[in-house]
């Protein structure tokens, strides 16, 4: 909070760094303001198999969170089912899970930290404390695409899905465009390569025999005759800084 005190603001939005989703944060904020919440948690329904890995909650008809437990064991899950929209119920997603996305009033967050000076975990400490002490804590029901990519497997599969014809997270959706930072790289060059369901970044030179269901990162080089299937290639996306160049005692690029 010491760093946050250096700025003038009224609300604190905390986002998780290991998730893939597209959310209208303006709508998230709007609900927070309308309900005069002190804390709003973005939530999504999940199946029982996944519920043990998330913070699970129970809410009332006003979406106010009445109970919260972090990563419940399988033997108590029956006590944590919620009423969910029909399409989620049909998929057996009966458990309301925290997405790790929080919107706090500034003073609420400062107060919770002051009352819990040694607490460093929102799910295990801060949120249960806020609910038990009757702070106004609400759930924001998110219904779009969301994927936890906190494991190597989930990160890998989410990337491969991007190369499919109609992925759930669509990079080419005109209504939800995705922008990256601009780069001054040449177009990628393919030399006689057969490609099926592939995303290829800028600046690549590819002379493979075949690439199938793969994501090829920027400035990649793939040699003649290679067969690439179900691969996420991060690419040469690291640029050396000046200190790195000096430590190698080489002539800087461009001279």
Language-model regions: role of each:
Residues 86-87, 107, 111-255:
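Left-handed beta-helix
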Residues 1-161, 252-253:
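Unchanged
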């Amino acid at each position: 909070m010491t760093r946050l005190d250096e700025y003038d603001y009224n609300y604190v939005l905390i986002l998780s760094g290991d998730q893939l989703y597209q959310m209208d944060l303006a709508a998230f904020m709007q609900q927070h303001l309308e309900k005069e919440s002190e804390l709003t948690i973005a939530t999504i329904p999940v199946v029982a198999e996944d519920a043990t890995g998330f913070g699970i909650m129970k809410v009332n008809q006003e979406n106010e969170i009445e109970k919260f437990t972090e990563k419940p064991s399988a033997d108590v899950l029956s006590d944590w089912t919620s009423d969910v929209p029909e399409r989620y119920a049909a998929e057996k997603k009966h458990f309301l899970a925290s997405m790790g996305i929080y919107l706090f009033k500034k003073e609420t967050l400062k107060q919770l930290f002051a009352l819990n000076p040694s607490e460093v975990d929102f799910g295990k400490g801060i949120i249960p404390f806020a609910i038990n002490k009757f702070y106004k804590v609400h759930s924001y029901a998110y219904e779009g695409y969301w994927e936890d990519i906190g494991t190597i497997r989930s990160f890998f599969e989410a990337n491969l899905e991007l190369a499919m014809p109609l992925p759930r997270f669509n990079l080419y959706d005109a209504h939800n465009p995705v922008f990256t930072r601009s780069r001054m790289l040449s177009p990628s060059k393919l030399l006689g390569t057969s490609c099926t369901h592939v995303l290829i970044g800028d600046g690549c030179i590819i002379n493979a025999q075949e690439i199938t269901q793969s994501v090829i990162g920027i400035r990649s080089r793939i040699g003649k005759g290679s067969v690439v299937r179900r691969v996420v290639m991060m690419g040469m996306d690291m640029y050396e800084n000046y200190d790195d160049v000096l430590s190698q005692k080489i002539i800087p690029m461009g001279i």
